[in-house]
Amino acid sequence: MIEKLEELRAQWRKLQQEVENPSLFSSTQSYRERMRDHAYLSRLMEEYDRYLLTEKQLEDAHVLIQDESDADFKDVIRQEIRTLEAALHTSQKRLKTLLIPPDPLQEKNIIMEIRGGTGGDEAALFAADLFRMYTHYAESKQWRYEVLAVSETELGGFKEITFSISGRDVYGSLRYESGVHRVQRVPSTEASGRIHTSAVTVAVLPEMEETEVDIRAEDVRVDVMRASGPGGQCVNTTDSAVRLTHLPTGIVVVCQDEKSQIKNKAKAMRVLRSRVYDLEESKRQVARARERKSQVGSGDRSERIRTYNFPQNRVTDHRVRVTLYKLDAVMQGALDDIIEPLCIASRESVI
């Protein structure tokens, strides 16, 4: 590991000289990429320096205790050695984690899709609750979000909603939210007070730039129509809604929230690029295709990654066996105690 870290230190020094002279780069994109690499290596070198310092302090402590004759002072040194050994172990674990090459998608913005699955109106209402949960979380991180497409129910729920979240490390934080979310609660329409179980699916896609996904104009069929609201009633007198069909893959995206056809088409293209990228990436990586299928599935209640139990104020993530009895806070966006263990488990599985 030390040999690898010394090689990376040489790369970091070279990169440090390069980023100080932006004129050497052929494009803004290449400069951004090098800055991202420099930031990663800087974090790694900072931890490596901490590791080396702790290692030297531990060596000095071992030498000191051999030369010391005072029993009380020896006890003090032994305690210091135990503290330094623990710090060295922690630093070593951090280095192993940091040595995992960063995912190029880590810093991407996302397109998030939430759909009501099993449970009818109650599933649609919970889909709306999840949307609010994620937007509260985004606000707490000072991220921005924008609704791209939504299909509402007459009770105020969402059959489905598609929205973007943009900011620092968005995809890296929220990528593990993909999957089936199960809710157990008494619906407001339930007179007998029985607990119902419903399911909602969440898909998280990295938002791709136009230059990153090749979609030819002739491969996209554009249909325009009048926007519709809950129950199917017409809510617009002009053909502002847009449906894009990607002919090679059959992917269909509909956007109708904006009054402008041009704006709806632009939003639909953002979603289409991300869906096409996700499909192509799944084909290239069979393992990822299997993971995505197991996460998203059909929305059936038997396929779940997380359960929200309202009567017990409990939320359980079944992948990392995390159970919290503060569902009320989670639904207001307090997700860090769930998201952080997922990120840690993912990194540790690669080490």
From Swiss-Prot:
<dbReference type="InterPro" id="IPR000352">
    <property type="entry name" value="Pep_chain_release_fac_I"/>
</dbReference>
<keyword id="KW-0488">Methylation</keyword>
<dbReference type="InterPro" id="IPR050057">
    <property type="entry name" value="Prokaryotic/Mito_RF"/>
</dbReference>
<keyword id="KW-0648">Protein biosynthesis</keyword>
<comment type="similarity">
    <text>Belongs to the prokaryotic/mitochondrial release factor family.</text>
</comment>
<feature type="modified residue" description="N5-methylglutamine">
    <location>
        <position position="233"/>
    </location>
</feature>
<dbReference type="Pfam" id="PF00472">
    <property type="entry name" value="RF-1"/>
</dbReference>
<dbReference type="InterPro" id="IPR045853">
    <property type="entry name" value="Pep_chain_release_fac_I_sf"/>
</dbReference>
<dbReference type="GO" id="GO:0016149">
    <property type="term" value="F:translation release factor activity, codon specific"/>
</dbReference>
<protein>
    <recommendedName>
        <fullName>Peptide chain release factor 1</fullName>
    </recommendedName>
</protein>
<keyword id="KW-0963">Cytoplasm</keyword>
<dbReference type="GO" id="GO:0005737">
    <property type="term" value="C:cytoplasm"/>
</dbReference>
<dbReference type="InterPro" id="IPR005139">
    <property type="entry name" value="PCRF"/>
</dbReference>
<dbReference type="Pfam" id="PF03462">
    <property type="entry name" value="PCRF"/>
</dbReference>
<comment type="function">
    <text>Peptide chain release factor 1 directs the termination of translation in response to the peptide chain termination codons UAG and UAA.</text>
</comment>
<dbReference type="InterPro" id="IPR004373">
    <property type="entry name" value="RF-1"/>
</dbReference>
